[in-house]
Curated annotation (Swiss-Prot):
Binding site for ATP: 138-145
Protein name listed in UniProt: Probable ATP-dependent RNA helicase spindle-E
Record gene name: spn-E
EC number: 3.6.4.13
Main location: cytoplasm
Organism annotation: Drosophila melanogaster
Sequence ranges assigned to domain Helicase ATP-binding in this UniProt record: 125-292
UniProt domain Tudor: residue ranges: 938-1001
Length: 1434
């Protein structure tokens, strides 16, 4: 343990040291949290409803009626009436004049009398003068939004009184467009008398503004900060019916302030579909009952409404009649909608005969709008309509989809007229209720359904629930017709059900969505506890939801665990993090991302990602169920192999910003967006939000640190740090990529694909051996054209006696069209991902083959292969294995030279034994008579041709890979030097055609080199990303290669690639790279370990074999190493292929699943959102047996609660123990649990902690548990405590102060320390340990003897210090047992019989066969465990 770590707590900083406090063990309210439960199950906490509301509301009513004005506030933390400024409500308010202002601007008092609201003008003004609150109910189009504020302003102008009106709108675009419309109508210059404010976008000065249109959130934040309404004379709350959380909380604030210090401000509530009685009761006092003024909007055209029971001509399913309680659309519902369209068409054909309007004109203005709840239902309806077209060719329809994730180009199709003779049918979600108006719609088919987002506050899981739409929604939908002519609405429910059963209004957001932002607003408002404030809502939430929200806010660091030092389950003091979160228009976890981004000096990246996560529809959806289009793969392109949807958002935005800043015109931007399948509209919204967040962060003091250029993070470090802050921001949305819990998982993978490389191979099934598959390889390759994989980039092979077809993709960067177009993380090639996606979209694919009975005559007539004893033998190329340059099975060490280095994972070695052969060939090739065949015409060079090409100063054998794709200069070709391994680009002048005699002599001679890779190591995710070897590691290998003759130790040979250890003077380069942290130790693949074991046993027996025996064994060995050949034969003509075989696949043995590590998600199935870059989840590092961590931005839950869907996912770096380290780093508190002997840590339990008296968790649902598979030591915990301390110190503020205590210079120093500590934590080489389930549970433990950690910030710590249980020394007797067990295993290693079942006690692994035992002894886990007990095999 180094001195720097031990000196951590001596960190000198002028901060107040507070006495240490117990963390996670503070008394709780037993009524809410004390329940008995099993460790693996989530406790069922009692649901506490709204009984708490009545007492609080009664007290508030007294306040509204003026009977509590003299009461003192309870407790210093609750601000109430006497803390607020007053407008002297007991005295007559002096009338403020504004004559000079009215002289500055022109006031035209002529209003539009054609609007229906005008008839109520005098009544509205009289009501406003007489009452503090007025409710106006007017249908859309009556003019209330633009006219009522003008009526008020005109009256003020007439009397010369001061007037300042604010009007809220739920959406930004509405506030801007309405303000501009009023300015245009009144001929006012914009941003003078009338203006707008959305977010932080506002005029430089509002001094001349008397009519302000703003979003609901803008007014709410102003009122919370000012705690008075008196800045305005009139507050108009428009679209009150929408009932989002901002509106409901605004009503709370307005009502409270109206009753206390702002009694002379007038409140006007307006909506089209308002529950007037509910609002009137909410604002009623003993002195005033708000009047309700209703105005009706007359339509020019009539609308007829029909219900299901009125559609007698449609045959409904008898079982459905009268049973509509379950909201759903079954197959009969879809068919009924199709029948209605047929009826509409027949009706218009008859009408055309009887009237002047032609049928074509009826089609043009007779569009049908079908309201469906989601994209799945849209696709299903489209399929039913397509079937209708096939059955009735007389009806021609143009199907148009409309939903929020579509591209703007596709959405424009909604407004375009259909082709002549076609009827437009628009399949839409509720987006067309109000956001989109299509004039030519004459018919609406409404299934009266909606998908509503609901969040479980205990689990934080959201779900889209299919529910009956409210009548208000249905009325909005009906209003889409009757614009140009009379219309019809078909509601697919019975009239009685519609009138009696369907809800009048939708569920308010406060009852179905997270309450974090509302609770934070209540804390900032500081007029009572969150419970006391939210109880006053129009629709108060359940007390359990408030309690869960408090716990969530404590989890994200927005609230301290305590209030004035005392634990309160329903409250907590506001942290500075919470203050920041309350001022950002984001979800709390997105705000946490920005906070951590600032701390780690990645603020800009965090802002962009947070803005992108807040804006839906960035990646355009093409519609339909197929994902094979380029739009899906754009996620991979922009994620750049990071495995992160969030990184993809960041890179898309940077690309867009580059287009904007470089001055490209709009058309260029549109072309770019269309090419890469991103939504330009969403990008513009993200851009606006990014700008707003930057301004807000600046106001909060969140400004990027001034860092010296030499201290800037490079791309590699930035990628790691970005993933660390993503893990911190979205804790505990953690998942692990799980593998089969089977000791023979590796063997099963290779057995499934017959020994092929799983990282490059997929397979089909259902192709019988009798089909003679070798003749159809080209036809099978053609299947991959749909994902644009060229045929030359794959080999198709078969296994004798099997129904499988194996497709192996070539691993060559020089092949045109190779996998680099779509970057992916890990070792798996992108072609494998594309192939698996093919199967996910369509399981079966047809292949046309000949009838087996006619096959033999076909191949015999054409001389294709041989037919021996009725069996067809495909033509094969003879292979002389004795000529191969591959290492012999008896060769352990080989001397030679490295001829070419691509990277540490691919280089070529030339044995010294070939030195004379190479020299002789070089002399022959470079003889003048052999170099006369100059290449004068590029057409003479063909792909795959063997030529003589110049390497350094001499010509050598080379194979042409392909021509360069450059037409503007002399022809050049990519060639590979056969006997050296390197590839290069050469002009024709440096190439010679090989004479025939040389081709005959050397054409079939295998390369005099073999490919190698470093054994038992892999690239470090911390040092280099995307499974790439770092430059430093490659440079070290090049330095060794330049030394000349070197010795390599062959570990294994698989797929003709040797895994080797390279010996140097001072050790082995493999170990040196690990020591220098340029790579990390890694297990070898199953096939590699199997080959290594085989080689070891053959080498041990070599002394007993003769030379001839050795040669025979080696030839058999090398022959067994060769995989089946791709015959690439031309298939029979299609006219001869009458039989269709349905291939099933492609499949990959690397497909895996995810599991949640939170307690609430442990038993649920987990999917990844189908649009995510991780939607195709493959085991990208199959040799690595660690569980890889995946972090989700959001988690959705299925309707039945059994399946979770992770959205916005990020695959974390493949670092040993990364998941456990992130839990220890970012959980509010954690416990390291020991094995039953107390000698090692075996699991990490993280969460909010527990009640010290009962050990019951505060927030059981969000407790996380990770079983350790690497060694976590005391040094690691001290490092993590350092990091937590530095994170806390950035925003630490004393209780009496509002701003953080540290200066900018101190923040730079903290950032520098954090970088260093994070790198040390992640780069550490940790030893593997066995998985131990003896103490892997969710039970919190208290240990009175455990010393409390030194707590620098006391109870004001967001990340308190972790305490640590001291480990015990391993018992001597136990060590002896483990060593004896190891010795026994090694003795059984060479046994040739049947192994009795035994267990490796070191690794807790059951061993059932000798081969399994041998391979287990070669794993890193076992070798590390042997070192830990000091075992040495003699």
């Amino acid at each position: 343990m180094d001195q720097e770590v031990m000196d951590f707590f001596d960190f000198s900083k002028e901060l107040k040291r507070v006495a240490a406090a117990p963390q996670g063990y503070i008394s709780s309210d037993p009524r809410l949290m004390a329940t008995k439960f099993k460790s693996s199950e989530v406790p069922n906490r009692e649901l506490i409803g709204t009984d708490y509301v009545s007492k609080i509301v009664a007290k508030e009513k007294c306040l509204l009626n003026g009977t509590l004005l003299n009461e003192q506030p309870q407790g210093k933390r609750i601000r109430t009436l006497d803390d607020l400024d007053t407008d002297d409500e007991g005295e007559e308010t002096e009338i403020r004049r504004d004559d000079e202002y009215y002289k500055k601007f022109r006031f035209n008092l002529n209003r539009d009398k054609n609007l229906s609201i005008y008839a109520k003008r005098e009544e509205i003004l009289a009501a406003i003068n007489a009452h503090p609150v007025v409710i106006i109910k007017g249908e859309t189009g009556c003019g209330k939004t633009t006219q009522v504020p003008q009526y008020i302003l005109d009256e003020a102008y007439k009397s010369g009184k001061y007037c300042n009106i604010v009007v809220t709108q739920p959406r930004r675009i509405a506030a801007i467009s309405i303000a501009n419309r009023v300015c245009q109508e009144r001929e006012w210059q914009q941003n003078t008398v009338c203006s707008f404010q959305v977010g932080l976008h506002r005029p430089n000065s509002l001094e001349d503004t008397r009519l302000l249109y703003c979003t609901t959130g803008v007014l709410l934040n102003n009122l919370i900060n000012n705690k008075t309404l008196t800045h305005y004379t009139h507050i108009v709350l428009d679209e009150v019916h929408e009932r989002d959380q901002n509106m409901d909380f605004l009503l709370i604030v307005v009502r409270r302030l109206l009753a206390t210090n702002s009694r002379h401000v007038k409140i006007i509530l307006m909506s089209a579909t308002i529950d007037a009685k509910e609002l009137s009761d909410y604002f009623t006092t003993t002195n005033s009952i708000p009047p309700v003024i209703t105005t009706n909007h007359r339509r020019k055209h009539s609308i007829e409404k029909f219900y299901r029971d009125q559609l007698g001509s449609i045959i409904w399913n008898e079982e459905d009649v009268g049973h509509q309680q379950v909201p759903e659309i079954n197959k009969h519902g879809y068919r009924a909608a199709v029948k209605i369209i047929v009826i509409i068409d027949n009706m218009e054909r008859k009408a055309a005969i009887q009237s002047r309007q032609s049928y074509d004109e009826a089609l043009r203005y007779g569009a049908v709008l079908i309201f469906l709840p989601g994209i799945y239902e849209i696709d299903t309806m489209a399929e039913n309509l397509t079937c209708m077209l096939e059955n009735d060719p007389n009806i021609k329809v143009s199907i148009v989809r409309c939903f929020s994730l579509m591209t703007p180009e596709n959405q424009r199709d909604v407004f375009n007229p259909p082709p002549p003779g076609f009827r437009k049918i628009i399949l839409t979600t509720n987006i067309a209720e109000s956001s989109i108006t299509v004039p030519d719609v004459s018919y609406v088919i409404d299934f009266c359904l909606a998908k509503v987002k609901v969040t479980d506050t205990a689990s934080s899981f959201s779900s889209l629930r299919l529910t009956w739409a409210s009548k208000a929604n249905c009325r909005q939908r009906a209003g889409r017709v009757g614009r140009l002519r009379s219309g019809r609405v078909y509601r697919m429910v019975n009239k009685h059900f519609y009138q009696r059963e369907m809800p009048e209004f939708g569920i308010p957001e406060m009852l179905r969505l997270p309450l974090q932002n509302s609770v934070l607003k209540a804390k900032v408002l500081n007029m009572g506890s969150p419970v006391e404030i939210l109880a006053l809502a129009l629709s108060p939430p359940n007390l359990s939801d408030i309690h869960n929200t408090i716990l969530l806010l404590k989890e994200v660091g927005a609230l301290y665990l305590t209030v004035d030092g005392i634990y309160d389950p329903l409250d907590g003091d506001l942290t500075y993090w919470g203050t920041i979160m309350s001022r950002l228009p984001l979800d709390t976890r997105q705000s946490r991302l920005i906070i951590l981004g600032y701390i780690f000096n990645m603020l800009e990246e965090a802002i962009i990602i947070a803005a992108g996560l807040s804006t839906p529809g960035l990646f355009a959806h093409e519609g339909g169920r197929s994902q094979l289009g380029d739009s899906f793969w754009m996620h991979y392109i922009f994620s750049d192999g990071s495995g992160s949807d969030l990184v993809a958002i960041w890179r898309v935005y940077l690309t867009y910003l580059n287009i904007v800043e470089n001055g490209h015109d709009q058309e260029s931007a549109i072309r770019w967006a269309k090419r890469f399948h991103v939504s330009l509209r969403s990008l513009k919204e993200i851009h606006l939000l990014v700008q707003e967040l930057r301004v807000r962060c600046t106001h909060l003091g969140l400004i990027p640190f001034p860092v010296n250029p030499n201290q800037m993070m490079d791309d590699r470090e930035k990628a790691i740090m970005l993933k660390v802050i993503i893990a911190g921001a979205f804790y505990p949305n953690y998942f692990t990529r799980s593998k089969e819990s089977c000791a023979d998982t590796d063997r099963n993978i290779y057995q499934t694909i017959s020994g092929h490389d799983p990282c490059r191979t997929v397979y089909f099934t259902n192709f019988k051996p009798a089909y003679m598959g070798e003749l159809y390889t080209r036809r099978i390759k053609e299947l991959f054209q749909e994902v644009r994989i060229p045929p030359e980039n794959m080999d198709v092979t078969f296994q004798e006696g099997s129904q499988k077809v194996f497709v192996t993709f070539k691993q060559d960067d020089w092949i045109e069209g190779s996998s680099k177009y779509v970057p992916v993380s890990g070792r798996v090639q992108s072609e494998v991902y594309k192939a698996v996606m093919m199967r996910q979209n369509r399981v079966e694919r047809p292949i046309h083959i000949m009838n087996p009975s006619a096959f033999m005559s076909y191949v015999q007539q054409r001389g294709i292969g041989d037919v021996i004893e009725g069996r067809w033998i495909p033509p094969t190329k003879p292979l002389n294995v004795e000529l191969l340059a591959l290492p012999s099975v008896f060769d352990k060490t080989i001397s030679g030279s490295i001829t070419c280095i691509v990277n540490c994972g691919k280089f070529f070695f030339q044995p010294q034994s070939f030195e004379e052969c190479i020299r002789n060939m070089s002399e022959i090739f470079n003889a003048p008579q052999q170099l006369r065949n100059y290449v004068t015409n590029a057409s003479a060079i063909a792909k795959g041709m063997m030529v003589l090409a110049k390497r350094d100063s001499y010509f050598q054998r080379a194979t042409v890979i392909r021509p360069e794709n450059q037409s503007n200069r002399q022809p050049m070709f990519y060639v590979r030097f056969i006997d050296y391994g390197n590839c290069t680009l050469l002009p024709m002048q440096l190439m010679r055609l090989m004479p025939r005699e040389l081709t005959e002599q050397y054409g079939d001679l295998p390369p005099r080199v073999f490919e190698c890779r470093l054994a038992m190591v892999q690239p470090s995710s911390v040092v280099s990303g995307n499974n790439r070897w770092s430059t430093a590691a490659n440079d070290m290998l090049k330095t060794v290669a330049q030394c000349g003759l070197i010795d390599i130790e062959v570990y294994s040979l698989f797929n003709n690639v040797a895994a080797v250890l390279i010996h140097m003077r001072d050790g082995i380069i493999n170990d040196k790279l690990v020591e220098l942290m340029l790579c990390r130790r890694s297990d070898e693949d199953y096939m590699s370990r199997k080959d290594h074991d085989f080689r070891l046993r053959r080498q041990e027996s070599a002394r007993n074999l003769s030379t001839a025996q050795r040669q025979q064994i080696n030839e058999e060995y090398l022959r067994s190493c060769q995989l089946p050949q791709d015959h690439d034969l031309p298939p029979p003509p299609l006219e001869k292929c009458k039989t269709v075989v349905m291939l099933k696949g492609p499949n990959s043995p690397l497909e895996c699943t995810m599991r949640s590590i939170t307690r609430v998600g442990l038993s649920k199935r987990v999917n990844i959102d189908h649009l995510s870059v991780n939607a195709l989840l493959l085991d990208a590092d199959p040799q690595d047996h660690h569980d890889h961590l995946i972090v989700a931005h959001e988690i959705a839950e299925s309707r039945n609660g059994q399946t979770l869907t992770a959205r916005g996912t990020t695959l974390m770096p493949n670092v040993q123990g990364f998941g456990a380290l992130m839990v220890m780093l970012f959980s509010p508190t954690m416990q390291l649990k020991c094995n039953k002997e107390g000698t090692s840590y075996v699991s990490v339990l993280g969460g909010l902690g527990c009640d010290p008296d009962t050990n019951e968790p505060y927030f059981a649902e969000h407790d996380v548990l990770i079983n350790l598979d690497v060694n976590i030591l005391e040094d690691d915990v001290i490092l993590i405590n350092q990091i937590r301390y530095y994170i806390d110190s950035v925003f630490f503020n004393f209780k009496e102060e509002n701003n953080p205590a540290v200066s900018v210079n101190e923040r730079v120093s903290i950032y520098t320390q954090l970088r260093s500590l994070i790198n040390r934590l992640l780069c550490k080489d940790r030893r593997y340990i066995e998985r131990n389930m003896s103490n892997a549970d969710f039970e919190w433990e208290t240990n009175p003897e455990l010393p409390l950690p030194n707590e620098p910030f006391g109870k004001r710590a967001i990340f308190p210090m972790h305490s640590l249980t001291e480990l015990q020394e391993e018992d001597t007797g136990r060590l002896v047992q483990l060593r004896e067990n190891c010795s026994m295993l090694h003795k059984w290693r060479n046994f040739e019989g049947t192994l009795p079942h035994m267990t490796c006690k070191l690794c807790n692994q059951l061993l059932e066969s000798v081969p399994q035992l041998r391979l287990h002894l070669l794993t890193i886990l076992h070798r590390d465990r042997e070192k830990q007990i000091d075992y040495c095999n003699q």
